[in-house]
Amino acid sequence: KDPFALRRSAIGLLRTIIDNKLNLKLRNLISYNIKLLEEQGVKKINENSENEILNFLKERMKNILKDKNIKNDIIEASISSYFSDNYFDLYKKNTLMNKYINKEAGINAISSYKRAFNILESAKENLSGRPDAVLFRKEEEKHLFEKLNEIRKSFSTNEQDKDYEKLLLSLSEIKIFTDKFFDNVIVNDDNNDIKNNRLELLKMFCNTFNNFINFSKLEGIS
């Protein structure tokens, strides 16, 4: 049921954004329209109106992604972790993940993440994802840390300038570094500080992946 055609209007707006590849900051647009309505005497219902509208649009985005045959777990992984207001950006992440998930790039990325994620789940530690480079004892720790920082710099660029395909392929290529890390580094070191620091490195690793989508929501991770 859609008596006021709100769902249809929202889907129409999102399709226009996607079809025209518009990198719009919808929060600004929504705030501007609310201001115009207030100037005409319409009272703002609550102070959270912008977030409620954005969440409503995000839910409608699920319908569009399903129509594009995006896998359900990819949709959940992206929607649950997305707090921006650029919905073309969200669409790009979904289509790219769907494209690569069963190819070597996707398989490598998921495999690397799963190994780190399962160790963190077993450890059940409260971690920040900020390891101390001073505590690294193995070259493999240093190399993984350096590679993660390189990828994180790419994530920090403006949304419209991000090359998400390149970012996803970078997450896949990090498997070389994680394989060497797991082959040569004992996470549960006898020294508690070193052990915790290695867990922090793995937390940083998972956090980096989750900047793309929440990999923990993908099928076969846990």
What are these regions (language model features)?
Residues 1-222:
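Amphipathic alpha-helical "coupling" segments that flank catalytic cores
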